[in-house]
């Protein structure tokens, strides 16, 4: 693994730890101010014509409130993540990671919120630090 690939793997690990710790502050610290997060309507919606933008462009207060609400109202049952691929630009200032996830949240009434499938996390190096600029919602493969 190259130096940059290792840096990206550490970013994935840091994000995973933030989910595991239910740490909204650390989670949003990983996001670039221009980040967007499109979501497929279903895990089978591979055609981007079926995708949505439920969060809009990154807004620190709004996104932190949303993630904190999840953390406050759901218990994390499992959060399994496996990096499948890391690709780095020739300039070493952009990269993406393909990650298979199996994350299960359950609320106090037993309602499940499951994220299971594959995601793509896109990174840009900004002022010497990696930030997530785009992240796809979960797709089944």
List PLM regions with ranges.
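Short, low-complexity N-terminal intrinsically disordered segments enriched in polar/charged residues
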Residues: 1-34, 110
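A solvent-exposed, acidic/Ser-Thr-rich amphipathic alpha-helical stretch
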Residues: 5-6, 24-91
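A short hydrophobic beta-strand element
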Residues: 77-81, 92-103, 117
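Short, solvent-exposed loop/turn segments at secondary-structure junctions
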Residues: 45, 104-106, 141
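A short, structured loop/turn motif at beta-sheet edges
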Residues: 86-95, 123-129
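Short, cysteine-centered beta-strand-loop-beta hairpins and adjacent loop/turn segments enriched
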Residues: 73, 104-113
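Short beta-strand edge/turn micro-motifs at domain boundaries
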Residues: 114-141
């Amino acid at each position: 693994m190259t130096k940059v690939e290792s840096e990206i793997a550490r970013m994935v690990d840091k994000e995973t730890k933030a989910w595991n710790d239910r740490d909204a502050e650390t989670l949003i610290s990983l996001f670039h101010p221009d980040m967007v997060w499109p979501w497929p309507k279903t895990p089978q919606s591979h055609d981007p014509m079926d995708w949505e933008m439920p969060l809009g462009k990154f807004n620190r207060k709004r996104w932190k409130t949303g993630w904190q609400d999840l953390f406050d109202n759901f218990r994390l049952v499992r959060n399994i993540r496996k990096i499948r691929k890391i690709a780095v630009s020739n300039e070493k200032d952009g990269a993406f990671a393909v990650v298979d996830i199996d994350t299960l949240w359950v609320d106090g009434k037993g309602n499940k919120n499951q994220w299971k499938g594959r995601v793509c996390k896109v990174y840009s190096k900004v002022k010497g630090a990696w930030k997530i600029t785009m992240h796809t919602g979960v797709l089944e493969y």
